[in-house]
């Protein structure tokens, strides 16, 4: 179902489409957190990437992340995109702060 949405939407150039991770709604002690108390989610999973941007010499600079990577996002920014009633966000490759490695 969600995979079909990505076949219909492909980011261009150095854009990266991500799905934010779900916010923690329950603490380790079992206390339910109200929505206002939940922190802003800065971690996401890459679901689609563009082909890259042109460098100064005209060559294509590939995007630095790939589908499936877990990345750290800036607190603000990104463009909200709704696909199959789910929220995703588009960021430029250079705006992504880093990626988590195993």
UniProtKB/Swiss-Prot annotation:
Q: Give the UniProt entry's GO cellular component terms.
A: extracellular exosome; membrane; mitochondrial matrix; mitochondrion
Positions of post-translational N6-malonyllysine modification:
40, 54, 56
Localization terms from the record: Mitochondrion matrix
Residues where N6-acetyllysine is found: 8, 40, 56, 66, 70, 80, 86, 99
One GO term in the molecular function aspect is: protein-folding chaperone binding
Q: Where are the transmembrane segments?
A: none
- The highest taxon in the source lineage is Eukaryota
Q: What induces it?
A: By stress.
> Which Pfam families does this UniProt record tie to the protein?
Cpn10
For this protein, the record's PROSITE patterns field holds: CHAPERONINS_CPN10 (PS00681)
Gene Ontology BP terms: chaperone cofactor-dependent protein refolding; intrinsic apoptotic signaling pathway; osteoblast differentiation; protein folding; response to unfolded protein
N6-succinyllysine modification sites?
Answer: 28, 40, 54, 56, 66, 70, 80, 86
Where Phosphothreonine occurs along the chain? 79
* SMART domains with a match to the protein in the record: Cpn10 (SM00883)
Q: Name the principal localization, coarsely classed.
A: mitochondrion
Q: What does this protein do?
A: Co-chaperonin implicated in mitochondrial protein import and macromolecular assembly. Together with Hsp60, facilitates the correct folding of imported proteins. May also prevent misfolding and promote the refolding and proper assembly of unfolded polypeptides generated under stress conditions in the mitochondrial matrix. The functional units of these chaperonins consist of heptameric rings of the large subunit Hsp60, which function as a back-to-back double ring.
Record family assignment: Belongs to the GroES chaperonin family.
Subunit note: Homoheptamer arranged in a ring structure. 2 heptameric Hsp10 rings interact with a Hsp60 tetradecamer in the structure of a back-to-back double heptameric ring to form the symmetrical football complex.
Note the HAMAP family from the entry: CH10
Q: What is this protein called?
A: 10 kDa heat shock protein, mitochondrial
Q: Which organism is it from?
A: Homo sapiens (Human)
